[in-house]
Swiss-Prot record:
Residues 16-35 bind DNA. Residues 13-81 form the HTH merR-type domain. GO terms for biological process: cellular response to nitrogen levels; nitrogen catabolite activation of transcription. The amino acid sequences of the N-terminal DNA binding domains of TnrA and GlnR are highly similar, and both proteins bind to DNA sequences with a common consensus sequence. In contrast, the C-terminal signal transduction domains of TnrA and GlnR have no homology. Under conditions of nitrogen excess, the DNA-binding activity is inhibited by the formation of a stable complex with feedback-inhibited GlnA. Induction: Under conditions of nitrogen excess, repressed by GlnR. Under conditions of nitrogen-limited growth, it positively regulates its own expression. This is HTH-type transcriptional regulator TnrA. Pfam families: MerR_1.
Length: 108
């Protein structure tokens, strides 16, 4: 995934109403998942929640796991592990990119 794709997916621009339409979840469910620390929307100065496309995907995953009977505490643990793995992958990719840049600069 390119940096532009990542920033596009993670940009928090959608209101809870749009997220509700995209996911089929109620506003109450979305707020509940936030309260259970499964989701972390940004807030505007006036307190309006803003969500990203990544948040929508995360909500769909949460809803699927809930439907499978998984407890929110277990989902939180799973999501934390996924988030950590994603961060580690990003760091690794940045390190590799830095090594490639350094290698090609030496060749010039």
């Amino acid at each position: 995934m390119s940096t532009n794709e990542a920033s596009y997916r993670d940009k928090k621009v959608m209101s809870i109403g749009i997220v509700k339409e995209l996911t089929g979840l109620s506003e109450r469910q979305i707020r509940y998942y936030e309260k259970r620390s499964l989701l972390f929307p940004d807030r505007t100065n006036t307190g309006i929640r803003k969500y990203s496309f990544s948040d929508v995907e995360r909500l769909m995953d949460i809803a699927d796991r809930i439907e499978e009977g998984v407890q929110t505490s277990e989902i939180r643990t799973e999501l934390a592990k996924k988030d950590e793995a994603r961060k580690m992958k990003e760091v690794k990719n940045q390190m590799l990119q830095g090594q490639l840049n350094a290698h090609f600069k030496r060749k010039l």
